[in-house]
Amino acid sequence: MESGPAIGIDLGTTYSCVGVFQNGKVEIIANDQGNRTTPSYVAFTDSERLIGDAAKNQVAMNPTNTIFDAKRLIGRRFNDSSIQADMKHWPFRVINKDGKPMLQAEYMGETKTLSPEEVSSMVLTKMKETAEAYLGKKVTSAVITVPAYFNDAQRQATKDAGVIAGINVLRIINEPTRAALAYGLDKKLTGEKHVLIFDLGGGTFDVSLLAIDDGVFEVLTTAGDTHLGGEDFDNRLVNHTSLEFKRKYKKDMRTNPRAIRRLRTAAERAKRTLSSSAQANIEVDSLFEGIDFYTSISRARFEDLCSDLFRKCLEPVERAILDAKIDKKKIDTVVLVGGSTRIPKIQKLLQEFLNGKELNKSINPDEAVAYGAAVQAAILSGDKSDEIKDVLLVDVAPLSLGIETAGGVMSKIIERNTRVPTKASQTFTTYSDNQPGVSIQVFEGERAMTKDNNRLGQFELSGIPPAPRGRPKIEVSFDIDANGIMHVTAKDESSGRSNKITITNDSDRLSKDDIDRMINDAERFKAEDDAQRERINAKNQLEGYAFNLKSAVDDAAAQSKLSPGDKETVTKAVNDVLQWLDSNSLADKEEFTYKLEELQKTCSPIMAKMHAGTGGPRGGGPQGFPSGGAGGPTVEEVD
């Protein structure tokens, strides 16, 4: 297969989307179900692995082995308070392995333990395959988006997920910036404009303020919450309705994962309805212990249940505007991105906060990020199309970066909202006389003390010549590349000795061995998926052939052409096969193929005799000669 263009992937908490820039425009690619967004779900069963729509569609039947929300786990520690809170809502198992959260599922009769990176890589593989099916070409490179407020560990982990999926990750880029790109290119803006991107998705929330001027997109400031989105609103509805169920029926259904999952699906549907109606019904038949549950919820009640979360959405907006040191009135446009921005109350609060500013709803909130990522992928792979040749994106570091100095103080070297790529240096000294070395500990965050910030890594600089405290000069340099990934160097000026660290092999990150193992696992999963597809094909061919034979010998025209003995031979052979299929539906592909050959050996001569008599067509059909393959349903046709 020839190599295709680079693609842009919006890897979302709840849904993902993929786009490609070709023939001078962006195309958002629909999946095999015809949907332009794909659920970020992976499910494991006794016989197969499912990704996307197929996984989400069976979640009520298989809640404990259907994994979603991997983006809420990626790059975090197990004891992170947000993970501990989310675990109360997740039906799947999350375990602690060396301080990292790992996911467990039963697959083909054994327990699989997967990292969040592996689960995300499966979703990325699905998006890559969706693009390949559409383009008819092999896709090797992609730009993958992350929330602007993702920290270093979360960015690195997302990049690892891409590597496991067999993708050459051209760049990890910020979601709101890509949405601004979608808006700017769509509107063909002229003159300098200040644009606020308000991006509220299924699990994360970002605000970015940009200055857009003739194809130059400069991020001024960014703010957000990597743990706020539509899922949190669903949780409020689920809690509210499960308590109502308990009040009405004196039964607690919250211990039953399947009941909670079915209630969550109904709650999510109700939430969407409330964006356009004043009231929504939640109906679930036989929800728990045979009880049919029915309730209705008004938009006002929903807004009350989520009021604190909705108000929380304004804090990053305020922070982004304050950091940019511009007046609210100077904002020309507010662009809404992410499915949760469809909620009327959120729109109303945002509009009031910005003194009644009109909100721009002209771009598709579900597709804007993938659209911008596709443009970025084209730019990075050297596409010189007129539409994008003058586009320049200038992004910023979302969090301040620095090192720990005496007393656990955070000494910032790069302030938040500094343009990237960037370099900055500061000179430090020793804390005690004749100190032979220093330990450089790197942190990101806004707090004054390092204990309240996020530690990225550390390294030692040794061999400092003996000298009184305060005399040696140690220059510490930070260098952030275009992926937002950081390299730190420390150099002793008197001896010229230096040491450096690339903040990649952070203790929270996967080692190279882990990544290699996961790549092999991904290939094994794919091989198992392919084998399963071939097995089902072989089963369907056998079943189709048997039923074609059955209808051919039962046909009135055939009665006169077949001797009673021949008819009995065919009927018995067909019934034996159908009985065998009933009790061996999980047999191997080879067994199905063998059974098909046996059946053909027995019945083909008889059917040929019959058709020689009629001079009829030899096509695959009830009257025609039943073929080994085309007669039966194929795997694509059968749901």
Swiss-Prot record:
Domain of life according to the entry: Eukaryota
ATP-binding is among the record's keywords: yes
Protein name stated in the entry: Heat shock 70 kDa protein IV
UniProt KW keywords: ATP-binding, Nucleotide-binding, Stress response
InterPro entries per record: ATPase_NBD, Heat_shock_70_CS, HSP70_C_sf, HSP70_peptide-bd_sf, Hsp_70_fam
Gene Ontology molecular functions: ATP binding; ATP-dependent protein folding chaperone
Region (Disordered): 609-639
Comp. bias intervals (Gly residues): 613-632
Family: Belongs to the heat shock protein 70 family.
Short name of any one Pfam family annotated for the protein: HSP70
UniProt xrefs under PANTHER family: HEAT SHOCK PROTEIN 70KDA (PTHR19375)
Xref: SUPFAM superfamilies: Actin-like ATPase domain (SSF53067), Heat shock protein 70kD (HSP70), C-terminal subdomain (SSF100934), Heat shock protein 70kD (HSP70), peptide-binding domain (SSF100920)
Membrane-spanning parts: none
